[in-house]
UniProtKB/Swiss-Prot annotation:
This is Large ribosomal subunit protein uL3. PROSITE patterns: RIBOSOMAL_L3 (PS00474). GO terms for molecular function: rRNA binding; structural constituent of ribosome. GO terms for biological process: translation. One of its GO terms (cellular component) is cytosolic large ribosomal subunit.
Length: 209
């Protein structure tokens, strides 16, 4: 069964398993997410649920969004996201999806916006090699060859060059759910997940199962 939830990355810590081994984990506040709309094939051309997550002051939302929440009978939220799930009949408008939809040991895919690094050179952005650092060399961290000379007389598209790094949608696949703390809506994920602390993340069943 497909499952999905929105959450907020709180940070990283470490826990110990029953054998005393240290496991680095990312703590995610997953939900509660409120169902605010059910999309159907007859009306919308596809099936999906629309969920909302995170509190926000009502004055910060415009009238169309306020009306959308009022129609569902739900208080205004910060984030809205659609998920395509298999069994829409089990969910009703106004119902909350909490962290306990997942279980320890499950595998999930987590999506978020990666940390922005600004304008970076090829060494940091693409892990390129440096030039000689010895005395007399004038080539240390420069780009190097960007292509041939008179033919083709241009630099090909997608050539790895300096530019903006980070701040893009990123998905990490097949991460393990180490622990669920349902009373606090917390999910502990083994390893790191994309984005900064307090960043929005999406948690779904892994496609690699």
């Amino acid at each position: 069964m497909k499952k999905a939830i929105l959450g907020k990355k709180l940070g990283m810590t470490q826990i110990f398993n029953e054998n005393g081994k240290v496991i680095p984990v990312t703590v995610i506040e997953a939900g509660p997410c409120t169902v605010i709309q059910k999309k159907t094939v007859e009306k919308d051309g596809y099936e999906a649920i629309q969920v909302a997550f995170g509190d926000i002051r009502e004055k910060l939302r415009n009238k169309p969004v306020k009306g959308h929440f009022a129609k569902a009978g739900v208080s205004v939220k910060r984030h809205i996201k659609e998920f395509k799930l298999e069994d829409l009949n089990s969910l009703e408008i106004g119902q909350e999806i909490k962290a306990d939809v997942f279980e320890a040991g499950e595998r999930v895919d987590i999506s978020g916006v990666s940390k922005g690094k600004g304008f970076q050179g090829t060494i940091r952005r693409w892990n390129a090699h440096r030039g000689p650092m010895s005395h007399g060399s004038k080539f240390h961290r420069a780009v190097g060859s960007m292509g041939a000379s008179s033919d083709p007389s241009r630099t090909f598209k997608n050539k790895r060059m300096p530019g903006h790094m980070g701040n893009v949608n990123t998905t990490v696949l097949n991460l393990e759910v180490v622990r669920i703390i349902p009373e606090k809506n917390l999910i502990l994920i083994k390893g790191g997940v994309p984005g900064p602390n307090k960043g929005l993340v999406q948690i779904r069943n892994t496609v690699k199962a």
